[in-house]
């Protein structure tokens, strides 16, 4: 929560199922719901949805909320507490979704196969909303990569 809400240019766009007056209120609400299933080791999920700079003009706060909620539905992250926070610390538009993996009925929201589902859902939403598709590895900001991705891109550059 500190990373998502603590940044200077962070804006809480939407909250559902939590008191959103302060960061502490949000944390208390998440903890109360997480106590319905204390065996779950990682009760909070975090997803960052990043978009191309090319899409910035059409990504209003309302559109970012709509895309985040649609993403959550497609990923089966429903019936639970969540917040959507927009960061404006980078040139590309992006939001962070923080959600309780214990739903409102005490059931665990699975994170199984998330990487595969995430890829499919992102492609679907980009196509549906006419968002920019990067043309492969050429658009990657290599100076910002960390290992092991940095080495992968160095190899890619050397081989091509």
Each model region followed by its residue ranges:
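N-terminal nicking endonuclease/strand-transfer module with a His-rich metal-binding environment
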Residues: 1-160
């Amino acid at each position: 929560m500190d990373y998502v809400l603590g940044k200077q240019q962070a804006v809480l766009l939407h909250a559902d199922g939590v008191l959103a007056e302060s960061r502490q209120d949000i944390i208390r609400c998440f903890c109360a719901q997480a106590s319905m299933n204390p065996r779950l080791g990682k009760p909070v999920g975090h997803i960052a949805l990043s978009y191309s700079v090319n899409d910035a003009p059409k990504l209003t706060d309302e559109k970012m909320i709509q895309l985040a909620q649609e993403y959550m539905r497609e990923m089966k992250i429903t019936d639970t507490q969540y917040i959507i926070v927009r960061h404006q610390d980078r040139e590309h538009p992006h939001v962070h979704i923080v959600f309780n993996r214990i739903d409102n009925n005490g059931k665990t929201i699975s994170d199984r196969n998330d990487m595969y589902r995430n890829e499919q859902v992102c492609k679907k939403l980009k196509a549906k909303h006419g968002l920019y598709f990067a043309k492969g590895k050429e658009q990657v900001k290599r100076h910002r990569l960390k290992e092991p991705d940095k080495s992968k891109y160095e190899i890619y550059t050397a081989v091509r």
